Regions:
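Noncatalytic alpha-helical scaffold of FAD-dependent oxidoreductases
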Residues: 1-517
Length: 517
C-alpha cells in the first residue's frame, strides 16, 4: 500500500479553542465531532486508507472556507479538502489528524448558458446532479465516471478526473474555463470566467486542476457543457487478442469518427469477476469465451432533419454495420449492439462497475497507468508472470517475497490479476485482487516493479487517479527531480506553511528524509 505512512508533520494539535472558532464561523451543526461523521470522512471508498481527524467542517459559502483556512493557517493546523471521497489513491482522507473540510453543502448549480454551452456551479455539486441539471437544458457534463453518483465536481477538477468520455470531450484542462479557489491563508482567487479565450498572462486555474487539494480549495467551477446527444449506442465486441482490440480502436476512429464518445476494454478475468459478483450482470455474448472485450459508445445529434445529420435509427444501423464488418474481417469474434436504453446500460455496466465488483471481492492493489496503446496489456501479462514465478519458487501455495515469512505469506492461488481501462486514451487499470487482504509479500512482488516497468516505457504512473497518499514516493518514476523541485516551489507560493493536504502528491525532500533518519 505504498509503504509506511509519512511521519506526522510539525502541525498544531486541534484544541477546544479551535473548535469554538469553527463554530463561530459555521454554526454548531456544521462542526462535526460525532463518531459517525468522523468514521465516514476518515476512511476512503476502498477502505484502504484511514486517518484520524478529530473534526469535520462543513462550509456553505466561499467566505466560510476563507475564514476557516485563515484560522488554520495562522494556527498551523493541517487540512484535507474532501469532495465525495471516491478517490482511489487515498488523497481525500487524512493520514494523521488533519482537519477534514467537506464540500458537500456547497452544491448549487449557479448558472447555465445553453447558447455559449457553459455552466458555473459550486465545487460540492455531485457530478450526477450536475448532469441531470444540464440534461434538462439539452446539455451534458464534459466528463462521466462510474463514481458519478457520489463524486463532486470540485473533486473531479482537483484530480483532473478522466473517465469514460475523454475520447470525445478531452481532459478537464481543456473543458474547465474558470475556477474560484481559496488558497492556504484564506485568499480568494476569483478566476471564474466562461470565456473561451483569455490570454491575460499565466493561466493560474490550470495549476489547481489536478493539484489534489495541495494548493487551494476549489469553491466554484466554470466549464464547457456540450450538447447532449439525442441518442447513444453502445456496442460490445469480443476479440481474440489485445492486438485485435487495438485494431478495432484504429478502425473505430476512422469508421465511427466524430460519433465516437468512448472506447473501453476489459479482459476475461474482469468479466468473470463482474458476472460472479454483481447481481443481474449477464455475459453479453454467452456463446463466446473471448480473452478481451471492447466497448464503444457512439452519439447522434439532432433529429436527422438537418443537412448531414442522421436519425438515431440510421446511426444504430451504422454501428451494427461496423460490428458486422469487424467480424467479417476477423478483427472481432462476435459483437452485440444495445437494442434499447436498458440493454445499452446493462452493456455499459459490465465495464463501468468492474471497480465495484473488485471492492466486493475484497482487498485490491490498483495501478492506473498511461502506456503506449499497443503495449498496454503487456504489463498485465508481465505481472501475472511475475506472480506465477514467485509462486512456483515457493515450496507451497503460500508464498513469501519478503524477509518476515509469518507476516508476508499469502495464498497466491486466490490472487487474480485484471486488466481493463480506457483503451482510447492509452490508460490501463491494472488491478490485483487479493480477497484475503493486503499482504506485504504480495506488495513486494508488485512494487516497485509496476512503476519501474511503466517508467521504462516512458509511461505515467498516474494516468487519471492522481498521486494522493499512495504514490508521492513513486513520483520520480514519472517526473525528473528538477520538475519535482519546481512543483515544490509552486506549493510554497500558495501554501507556504504546507497546511493543505500534507503527505500527498509531493515526495519529501531528500534533506527532509535524512533529517528524520
Ligand atoms: P475526493 O475523493 O473527495 O478527493 C479527491 C482529491 O481531491 C483529494 O486529494 C481531495 O483533497 C481533493 N479535493 C476534493 N474536493 C476538493 C476541492 N473542492 N478543492 C480542492 N481539493 C479537493 N477517476 C477517474 O479519473 N476516472 C474514472 O473513470 C473513475 N472512475 C471511478 C469509478 C469508481 C466506482 C470510483 C469509486 C472512483 C472512480 N474514479 C475515477 C476516482 C474518483 O472518482 C475521482 O478521482 C473523482 O474525481 C474524485 O472526486 P471526489 O469528489 O470523490 O473527490
Ligand atoms: C474506471 O475507469 C475507474 O473504472 C476505476 O477509473 C479504475 O478501479 C479502478 O482501478
Ligand atoms: Zn478509469
Amino acid at each position: 500500500m505504498g509503504g509506511d505512512p509519512a511521519p506526522r508533520g510539525d502541525f498544531a494539535v486541534l484544541t477546544d479553542a479551535d473548535l469554538a472558532a469553527f463554530r463561530e464561523i459555521l454554526g454548531d451543526d456544521n462542526v462535526r465531532t460525532d463518531a459517525r461523521s468522523l468514521d465516514a470522512c476518515n476512511e476512503d471508498w476502498m477502505r484502504k486508507y484511514r486517518g484520524n481527524a478529530g473534526v469535520l467542517l462543513l462550509p456553505a459559502r466561499t467566505s466560510q472556507v476563507s475564514a476557516i483556512l485563515r484560522h488554520c493557517n495562522a494556527r498551523g493546523l493541517a487540512v484535507v479538502p474532501q469532495g465525495g471521497n471516491t478517490g482511489l489513491v487515498g488523497g481525500g482522507v487524512p493520514v494523521h489528524d488533519e482537519i477534514v473540510l467537506g464540500m458537500r453543502r456547497m452544491n448549487a448549480v449557479l448558472s447555465v448558458d445553453p447558447v455559449a454551452g457553459t455552466v458555473v456551479c459550486e465545487a460540492g455539486c455531485v457530478l450526477e446532479d450536475l448532469e441531470h441539471a444540464l440534461n434538462a437544458r439539452g446539455m451534458t457534463a464534459p466528463l462521466d465516471l462510474g463514481a458519478k453518483g457520489r463524486c463532486q465536481i470540485g473533486g473531479n477538477v482537483s484530480t483532473n478526473a478522466g473517465g469514460l468520455r475523454l475520447v470525445r470531450h478531452g481532459s478537464l484542462h481543456g473543458s474547465v474555463l474558470g475556477l474560484e479557489v481559496v488558497t492556504a491563508d484564506g485568499t480568494v482567487l476569483d478566476l471564474v470566467r466562461t470565456l473561451r479565450k483569455d490570454n491575460t498572462g499565466y493561466d493560474l486555474k490550470q495549476l489547481f486542476i489536478g493539484a489534489e487539494g495541495t494548493l487551494g480549495v476549489v469553491t466554484k467551477v466554470a466549464m464547457l457543457a456540450p450538447r447532449k446527444p439525442t441518442g447513444v449506442d453502445v456496442a460490445v465486441c469480443a476479440v481474440g487478442s489485445f492486438a485485435d482490440a487495438v485494431a478495432a480502436l484504429r478502425d473505430a476512429r476512422t469508421k465511427l469518427g466524430d460519433c465516437l464518445q468512448a472506447f473501453e476494454f476489459f479482459d476475461r478475468a474482469s468479466l468473470e469477476l463482474v458476472l460472479s459478483t454483481l447481481r443481474g450482470a449477464r455475459d453479453p455474448l454467452p456463446k463466446t469465451k473471448a480473452p478481451f472485450y471492447v466497448v464503444t459508445e457512439t452519439a447522434v445529434f439532432g433529429d436527422g432533419s438537418g443537412k448531414g445529420s442522421v436519425t438515431h435509427r440510421a446511426a444504430r444501423r451504422r454501428v451494427r454495420a461496423w460490428v458486422r464488418s469487424l467480424r467479417k474481417r476477423g478483427v472481432a469474434i462476435d459483437g452485440v449492439v444495445g437494442e434499447d436504453a436498458k440493454h445499452a446500460s446493462a452493456l455499459w455496466n459490465l465495464r463501468e462497475r468492474i471497480s465495484v465488483a473488485l471492492k466486493h471481492a475484497g482487498a485490491v492493489y490498483k495501478y492506473d497507468v498511461s502506456l503506449p496503446t499497443e503495449r498496454m496489456y503487456d504489463l498485465v501479462v508481465e505481472t501475472r508472470n511475475r506472480l506465477a514465478a514467485s509462486t512456483s519458487a515457493s515450496t507451497s501455495t503460500s508464498t513469501s517475497a519478503s524477509t518476515s515469512a509469518a507476516s508476508t505469506s499469502f495464498d497466491a492461488s486466490k490472487v487474480s490479476v485484471l486488466g481493463y481501462g480506457h483503451l482510447g486514451d492509452g490508460n490501463l487499470h491494472l488491478n490485483v485482487s487479493s480477497p484475503d487482504g493486503y499482504h506485504p509479500g504480495l506488495e513486494a512482488i508488485l512494487e516497485p516493479f509496476v512503476y519501474q516497468w511503466t517508467a521504462e516505457q516512458r509511461g505515467s504512473i498516474s494516468a487519471e487517479h492522481g498521486v494522493g497518499a499512495m504514490k508521492p514516493r513513486e513520483l520520480a518514476h514519472s517526473k525528473d527531480e528538477a520538475s519535482i523541485e519546481a512543483m515544490r516551489r509552486v506549493k510554497e507560493v500558495f501554501d507556504p506553511r504546507g497546511i493543505l493536504n500534507p503527505y500527498k502528491v509531493l515526495p519529501p525532500r531528500l534533506t527532509e528524509h535524512r533529517s528524520k533518519l
